[in-house]
């Protein structure tokens, strides 16, 4: 059964939405409106550096809140063997030529930044980070090979984006463990011994997430239990000299790996948009063209110039893949 949701964003961390179900039966049940106040603040930090990411299940009007600093890398549960960095902490990485983790130390970090600057971001810094669009084939960490010798040591800056305290750099090496699991070797960059962790793929998650402090953690809902998320994250910008990595707050991420799709409906002014939102129904949904992509909403819902706030001339139609 498909679920369509229309969303009118009314404040930085509040959403109003109407859900309607599309079924084989042409009779649609009445839609219900709901408003969710997002729990983005982890402690006393400003909203522009909210410590939490918030994941929303729109059809269930549920949210899951997780600390952005609560995980470091994610192990893909799909057919390929891929590992992602935590873009919400702005983690960066570099792959070395070595495959002996004990032989890598602080000297290997000389000259490395593995980060970006809000005041002077550079195009050449893009290589430190995973593909912004979320293409799982374009991660900094290469696909994990079935041949152990091909899997090199990787240095990771865990990231300090959005007020996260700087933490020691980490060195890792990842191997395949049979046909459905990974072996992670990891240590602080100055350590000469390493820890080992086994991570099994499963059928209910897109990624199994790992914290270098706490091991395997539950820092994202199961793949079919969220539609969109709200977070501070690494993204990209163009200030005239090409794309550069740039950190943004209040970004909306779409669960594109689960097939969630989106349409943005823009109108002449706020009053027209509100009237269209109130009139939107199942027939409107059926006639709407939706698109896929991790950042189909991104920051388009809000304005920073000349005034900061939600853009009231638009709303969004979201369809899950269930």
Language model regions located:
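C-terminal motif of bacterial Sec signal peptides marking the signal peptidase cleavage site
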Residues: 15-19
């Amino acid at each position: 059964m498909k679920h369509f949701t229309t969303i009118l964003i009314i404040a930085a961390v509040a959403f109003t939405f109407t859900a309607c179900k599309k079924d084989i039966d042409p009779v649609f049940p009445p839609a219900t409106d709901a408003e969710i106040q997002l729990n983005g603040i982890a402690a006393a930090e400003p909203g522009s550096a909210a410590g939490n990411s918030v994941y929303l299940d729109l059809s269930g009007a549920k949210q899951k809140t997780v600390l952005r600093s609560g995980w470091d890398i994610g192990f893909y549960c799909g057919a390929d063997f891929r590992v992602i960095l935590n873009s919400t902490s702005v983690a960066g990485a570099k792959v070395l030529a070595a495959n002996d983790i004990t032989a890598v130390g602080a000297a290997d970090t000389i000259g490395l930044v593995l980060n970006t600057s809000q005041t002077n971001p550079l195009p050449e810094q893009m290589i430190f980070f995973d593909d912004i669009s979320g293409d799982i084939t374009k991660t900094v960490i290469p696909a994990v090979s079935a041949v152990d010798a091909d899997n090199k040591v990787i240095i990771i800056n865990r990231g300090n984006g959005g007020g996260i305290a700087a933490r020691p750099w980490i060195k890792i090496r990842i191997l395949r463990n049979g046909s459905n699991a990974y072996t992670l070797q990891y240590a602080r960059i100055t350590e000469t011994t390493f820890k080992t962790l086994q991570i099994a793929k499963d059928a209910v998650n897109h990624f199994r997430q790992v914290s270098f402090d706490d091991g395997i953690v539950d820092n994202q809902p199961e793949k079919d239990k969220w539609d969109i998320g709200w977070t501070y994250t690494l993204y990209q910008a163009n200030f005239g000299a090409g794309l550069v990595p740039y950190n943004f707050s209040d970004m909306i991420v779409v669960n594109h790996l689960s097939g969630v799709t989106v349409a943005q409906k823009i109108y002449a002014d706020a009053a027209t948009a509100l009237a269209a939102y109130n009139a939107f129904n199942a027939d409107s949904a059926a006639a709407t063209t939706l698109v896929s992509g991790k950042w189909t909403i991104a920051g388009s819902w809000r304005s920073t110039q000349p005034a900061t706030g939600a853009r009231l001339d638009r709303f969004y139609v979201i369809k899950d893949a269930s």
